[in-house]
A protein has these predicted regions:
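Catalytic or ion-coupling anion/metal-binding cores of large enzyme and transporter domains
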Residues: 7-10, 14-277
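Single conserved hydrophobic/aromatic residue that forms the stacking wall/gate
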Residues: 1-9, 13, 278-288
Length: 288
C-alpha cells in the first residue's frame, strides 16, 4: 500500500506540473524532470533567469493564462490521464485570473481526447520513464499535429506554443503513444449529476476493460453500475467504520464520503487511497 501511495502521489505531482507547462506557465520540458537529475537544477536556474526577463518585458500571467490556454491545459491533462484533482486546481486558478471556466469545460474539451501516456495508474510506466520518453513536449506535439490544441498562444518563453515545439523530439512510443495507436480512444473526464450530488467528476482513463466487462456491460443498462450505497459522514467516520462487519461491503458497494468539499471540510479533504483501508483480511472474514 505504501508503494502504491507513493506512486500515485508521484503521478499527482506530475499532473500539476504538466498542467502548468500546458498553460504556458513553465519552461518547455520542465514539468516531469525527476528531482535528482542535473537537468532539474539547470532548468531551475533558467526559470529564475527567465522570470527576471519577463518582468522587464512586462509579460504577466494574465497575458499567458487566457481562456484558450486553459483549454490547452484540459486537453493535455486528458491526454496524460491526469488526476481528477486537476479539475479543482485549474478552475480555482481560472477564477483568480478572471476567466470563466467550470467543470463542464472538462467534459466538452477533454472527454474525446485519447490517452497518449502509458503511465500509471492507467498504464505501465512511472514519471522517470515518461520524462525519458519525451515528456509533455512530446504529448503537446502529438496533440498539435492532430490540431487539438491552440498553437499561437504566448508562453513564459515569450514565444508561442508552436515555436516552443519546433525542436525535434526523440519519442519512445512504448511510453507516449500516437493518436492512432493510443491506449484508449476517450480518456477525459465525465461530469455527473444526480440525487447524490449536484456535480461530480469521473476519470474515465482508469476504467479497465475487465471492470467494463464485469460491471458496465448489461445490454439493458449499458455503462450503468448498480450497487448498494454505503454513506460516511466525512473522512474520520470512514476511517472509523470502513472495516465494520455490519456494513457488509463487497465489490458491488458504492462508498460515499460526505462533507469533503471546500465548504464542508473546509478546503477539501484528502481522501486519496481510501480503499487501502478496506483490508483484504476483513473481506475474507466477512465473505469467506
Amino acid at each position: 500500500p505504501h508503494t502504491t501511495t507513493r506512486r500515485q502521489r508521484q503521478m499527482c505531482i506530475r499532473d500539476r506540473n504538466s498542467v502548468a507547462e500546458a498553460l504556458g506557465m513553465s519552461l518547455p520540458g520542465c514539468a516531469v524532470i525527476p528531482a535528482p537529475y542535473r537537468e532539474r537544477e539547470q532548468i531551475s536556474f533558467e526559470t529564475g533567469s527567465r522570470i527576471v526577463k519577463m518582468v522587464h518585458e512586462d509579460l504577466t500571467p494574465s497575458k499567458i493564462m487566457t481562456k484558450k490556454a486553459f483549454e490547452n491545459a484540459v486537453i493535455v491533462a486528458s491526454a496524460i490521464g491526469a488526476s481528477s484533482n486537476c479539475t479543482t486546481h485549474l478552475i480555482a486558478i481560472a477564477k483568480h485570473m478572471g476567466v470563466k471556466f467550470d467543470l463542464s469545460n472538462w467534459q466538452k474539451l477533454g472527454h474525446k481526447i485519447p490517452l497518449l501516456a502509458n503511465c500509471q495508474p492507467a498504464g505501465e510506466h512511472l514519471m522517470e520513464g515518461f520524462y525519458r520518453a519525451g515528456g509533455i513536449p512530446a504529448i503537446m506535439k502529438e496533440l498539435m499535429k492532430n490540431k487539438k490544441i491552440h498553437q499561437n498562444l504566448i508562453t513564459v518563453t515569450g514565444k508561442t506554443v508552436a515555436q516552443n515545439l519546433r525542436k525535434k523530439i526523440d519519442v519512445d512510443r512504448d511510453v507516449i503513444k500516437t493518436f492512432k495507436d493510443n491506449l484508449t480512444d476517450k480518456a477525459g473526464f465525465l461530469v455527473m449529476k444526480g440525487n447524490f450530488f449536484s456535480s461530480a467528476i469521473m476519470k474515465t482513463s482508469v476504467i479497465s476493460k475487465e471492470f467494463r466487462d464485469r460491471y458496465l456491460s448489461n445490454p439493458k443498462h449499458p455503462n450503468v453500475f448498480k450497487g448498494k450505497a454505503v454513506v460516511f459522514e466525512g473522512p474520520e467516520d470512514y476511517h472509523d467504520r470502513i472495516n465494520s462487519k455490519k456494513l457488509k461491503i463487497d465489490e458491488n458497494s458504492i462508498l460515499i464520503i460526505r462533507g469533503c468539499g471546500p465548504v464542508g471540510y473546509p478546503g477539501s479533504a484528502e481522501v486519496v487511497n481510501i480503499c487501502l483501508l478496506y483490508t483484504s483480511d476483513a473481506a475474507d472474514e466477512w465473505w469467506g
